Amino acid sequence: LKEISASIKEEFNVDCNYIAADLADSSAPEMIYNFCSENNYIVEVLVNNAGYSINKKFHETGEDEEEKFLRVLGIAVVALTKKFIPSMLEQKHGKIMMVSSLASFAPPSSGWGSLYGPIKTFVNRFGDAININYRSQGITATNVCPGFTVTEFHTASGMQDAMDKVPAFMKKDSKTVAIGAVQAMLKGKSVWVPGALNKLLAFLCNILPTSIVIKMSSSLAGGRYE
């Protein structure tokens, strides 16, 4: 974080600060909020982007692993949004990015990652709720739903072998996705799915029977869902 902060300062000639926090810790959202308040930061944009995946079958995971996972990908999203919404209401302006996934539209993968897709579906619905309740007051939430994106996510989650099976035409670079996501958020879009193929897949997931979607996903992902 220190290196990235210094790089941003140098490249863009702006002030950039940071705080290290473990969102698996229930006190982290409060700590982040207090850090911003103590530094008199007026938060106009909130990006809920923390995430990872558990590379185990559901029966192999411990309850503590699942609780931490759900806290980072779900509870912390709600808690941080809850903390910063009041000041956005005072400003009558605010942008919130919910970094979700194309997996939020599809059935969970067979045996693996049984919680990832479902929690991302929750994030989408939560983003929808923010829009329904606060768009008229100047606050918008954008559900960003990327497909396979080249980042350190899969390596960190012990899933790089699975990622390597995915055809190159289905992968997008992280910079392209990040730029598109920010543009969509600033425009106040409710949902943004990068790329024509991913948009088609999201559409098909909503209209095709679940059994067909599972087979289609497995085929396109090089057996990742088998």
Where are the regions a protein language model picked out?
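Substrate-binding pocket helix/loop in short-chain dehydrogenase/reductase
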Residues: 57-59, 65-69
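C-terminal helical subdomain
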Residues: 143, 164-201
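Active-site-adjacent segment of SDR/Rossmann-fold oxidoreductases
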Residues: 11, 106, 128-140
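Residue(s) in the substrate-gating loop at a strand-loop-helix junction
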Residues: 101
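Rossmann-fold cofactor-recognition segment
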Residues: 10-26
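Active-site helix of classical SDR
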Residues: 81, 119
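Conserved NAD(P)H cofactor-binding loop of Rossmann-fold oxidoreductase domains
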Residues: 49-54
